[in-house]
From Swiss-Prot:
Comp. bias regions, Low complexity: 212-252
GO CC terms in record: nucleus
One Pfam assignment: Forkhead
Primary localisation category: nucleus
Gene, per the UniProt record: foxd1
Protein name: Forkhead box protein D1
GO annotation, biological process: anatomical structure morphogenesis; cell differentiation; ectoderm development; forebrain development; mesoderm development; negative regulation of cell migration; negative regulation of DNA-templated transcription; negative regulation of transcription by RNA polymerase II
Amino acid sequence: MTLSSDMSDVLAEETDIDVVGEEDEPRAEEEEEEDGELLMPRSPHCSSTKDPYKAAGSGGVGRSALVKPPYSYIALITMSILQSPKKRLTLSEICDFISSRFPYYREKFPAWQNSIRHNLSLNDCFVKIPREPGNPGKGNYWTLDPESADMFDNGSFLRRRKRFKRQQVPELVLREPGHFLPASAYGYGPYSCAYGIQIQPFHPHSALIAFQQQQQHQQQQARHQQQQARHQQQQARHQQQPPSLPSMAAPALMPPAAQDLSRTCTFYPHQLSPAALPPSLQSKSSSALARSTFSIESIIGGDLNPGPKAAGVPVISRALVTFSSSEAAAALGGNLQPGTVLTNH
């Protein structure tokens, strides 16, 4: 009995070991299945149902190796543009950078190329730069807007802080298609440390201020030139006037009383005394009175003695006395007798 009990204990231990070992039973079942497969002919339906599982198992290992990067398309485009020397790339160059850095996108190319194109066109943080006339190639360049430097949170491409909205720039700052942004426009402080870019930060409003100052300076120069041209024209007009008529050339420089006096002297050169005339006309009027005997008294037949008759002297129209005494004497042949009346023909 003792031996039988010992043998039973050993058998119990062996059975316990077999139950705990989970790998032995499937192997036995697989051996039985293989024996059954050897004995029984394999049907095409069974083989077709068993192959997809093997294929799925082999394909699952390949898919697990290609993990999609945790970056958005905007972050991928920003990475590619910042690593370029000129901070601008074409669509094909952006796709080449993403494919070379991330195996997932290398295997999925070109399925995601349209997504890159749409993100470039629809997001304001990307700016299109036309290709130079002398630079052959296909496609335009793309760069980053200088004001989108704080688009990502603390310079991390995993988190985007906010959606960038481009501000409306005045038309005065718009550049021609052949002109491009300066090199200082591509400096970004938050990203320069990660990519080894050491460029001075770009101030977007400096170009606008400089342009406005330049335009104001040009307008001031144009106004100054116009004033100089007007002044020269006025001087030329004064120089072209005949010097024999000082009363016509100098009224603007005389005081108002002298201007009225000069106009009166033009029509009544012999009614005024030489002392009341301007200095420029005193010598001329005195010489004319000395040469001619023509006077108002000779016309009206009065005498030279002042008296009560002087108060009744009629006023002669300005149209009758519009010529000098020398011209009147020449017209009458030098014969002018007292009592002769001149009429306007």
